[in-house]
Amino acid sequence: MCIRDREIGISIAGTRDGAPLLVMPYSEGLVGAPGRLHGGAIAGLLEIAAIAAIDATLDEPADGRSIFKPITVTVDFMRMGKLTDTFACGEVVRVGGRIANVAVTAWQESPDRAIAAARMNLAISPKPAQG
């Protein structure tokens, strides 16, 4: 997890179907319109869940991890985000040599009642050599 993830409180809460299950605890800084979770916070959670799913799929040592850069991101907002904890989990559809395709879902009360979903294509770049 990176600094941005910690700033909005995202952490790994466990696994779901073998993929990391992320939680974004509710905080006042995540409020958009009164009584609603900000769509940008939800989209950020979806992106981080996609990266976590890919990272868990790749067989890399911790010090040699790849860098993931979004190529295309499509987010569907299905329900209003309530002022409560939000969960997300990604499913890696395909990982190629340079591109990964991931489907991600975010929910609050039940995984069967998604508040948002995303399809993402991310470029996989090797970590730059330090020198």
Predicted regions and their residues:
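Conserved small/polar residues in nucleotide/adenosyl-binding loops
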Residues: 1-5
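Compact, glycine-rich, soluble single-domain proteins
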Residues: 34-55, 70
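Hydrophobic residues in beta-strands and at strand termini
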Residues: 24-26, 77, 124
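Hydrophobic beta-strand-centered segment that forms part of the acyl-chain substrate-binding groove
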Residues: 53-87, 92
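Catalytic strand-loop segment that frames the active site of acyl-thioester-processing enzymes
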Residues: 7-37
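A generic structural signal for short beta-strands and their flanking turns/coil linkers
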Residues: 8, 18-20, 69-73, 84, ...
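Feature marks short, surface-exposed loop/turn motifs that line or immediately flank catalytic pockets
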Residues: 30, 52, 124-126
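HotDog/MaoC-like acyl-thioester-processing domains
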Residues: 80-83, 87-89, 93-131
